């Protein structure tokens, strides 16, 4: 099947090419009158036999213009005026002068659509029949299109002319049948059908009934060559630049913008206003300008007196809490709190270590992911740990502050995981002593510090969630590193010597190494509010 179609296409190409180069001559009856189609064909054969004046050019074109010039056929004149003048129709009278009958704006383009399709408009049938000169040629009408839109001289404008053949359609044939049968005679339905068939035979083009695929391919090829630039997408593009479309755009530009485009209109006007502004900026040559900044006076005299109270800032001392005296431990005490939670598809297990070293009254904390193989490493005190581990420990303060840190971290993990949290506690350091020795040791180790007892109270910094942690869409919990970054001190814990006496006063350098957040009363008030 595909091979037969390919052969038919090749045959159609050969027929079209041979008809353009050497069209065959037709024989007509001597008594018969030639129709306009036969005249056009004879003119086509005649032009093909002539040699072109310029090579690569053909003479068998513009046949309708040549036929009108040879036989002076009557035509329907259509004038296309520039701008908003519209278009008009003219008919020729008996005296040979043309008279304008209809003038319409470009917005009413129904007649132009019929002219573009080379079809006879049904609304002009009655007007053309009443014309003083016979304008019909075998049911067709020759229209001359005079285009004045490309003329530059408005006083005596010239025009570009071309001719088209308006063919009758079924709608015009129905109008003809109705006008013929509207007299006083009685027409039966059979008479009307017979009249319609005769009109179709008289106006229709020759029909080829050869049952060959090549005939259909040839007809399609000829139709394509004639209508290749008359497709719907091309018409849509042309309508954007038609006179009616340009007039509509011009009217909209002068009128007020719709409510939906007020912002666009404002931006467009502001852009035009800025484009119209011109700034006369001139850069003078070097040496011609005066530096006013260098010429301004500069007073650099040293003041004799300085108001210290105006620039100084007094920091209030931290009030002491005598209800809980500072305890000097007799040994290292380490408490491990393991928090386990499982939310969704994730499992989290972190460990909070609270440590009080020997000879140090302060508690330190460390948060890390829990691992079984790190049990030995976690037993090291911050004073004996390496320099790399100092950044992981943060200062907590007293025992009450350590309990508060545990509660806050448990609430933090539970809020982030949005599920119940299991906490397990294990302590080391004091378990090696007997109950009696532990009581005696605690009694002898409870000593007030000469410095810390005078109003120094260490409070842990408040635990705050990061701004984006609560809105995280990934579902990750608050990690140990994030919590430790909010709890740890910017300074590492002090390294206490084992030989330091418990009765001696605390060195002032140790107090200065505490974080400002841990010592400030503002952080303590924020923690109580949280």
Swiss-Prot record:
GO cellular component, one term: SAGA complex
A molecular-function term among this protein's GO annotations: transcription coregulator activity
Stored Pfam families: Spt20_SEP (PF12090)
Residues the record lists as Phosphothreonine modifications: 491
Domain of life: Eukaryota
Sites bearing Phosphoserine, chain numbering: 296, 515, 520
GO BP field: gastrulation; positive regulation of DNA-templated transcription; positive regulation of gluconeogenesis; positive regulation of transcription by RNA polymerase II; regulation of DNA repair; regulation of RNA splicing
Low complexity biased stretches: 424-436, 467-476, 514-530
Keywords noted in UniProt: Developmental protein, Gastrulation, Phosphoprotein
Tissue spec: Ubiquitously expressed throughout development.
Chain segments carrying region Disordered: 419-530
Keyword hit for Phosphoprotein: yes
Polar residues composition bias: residue spans: 442-451, 477-486, 502-513
Free-text disruption phenotype from the record: Mice show gastrulation defects in which mesoderm migration is defective due to deficiency in E-cadherin protein down-regulation in the primitive streak. A weaker mutation named droopy eye (drey), which affects splicing causes incompletely penetrant defects in neural tube closure, eye development and gastrulation.
Assembly behavior: Interacts with ATG9A. Interacts with MAPK14.
Protein purpose: Required for MAP kinase p38 (MAPK11, MAPK12, MAPK13 and/or MAPK14) activation during gastrulation. Required for down-regulation of E-cadherin during gastrulation by regulating E-cadherin protein level downstream from NCK-interacting kinase (NIK) and independently of the regulation of transcription by FGF signaling and Snail. Required for starvation-induced ATG9A trafficking during autophagy.
Family: Belongs to the SPT20 family.
Name of the protein in its database record: Transcription factor SPT20 homolog
Lineage: Eukaryota, Metazoa, Chordata, Craniata, Vertebrata
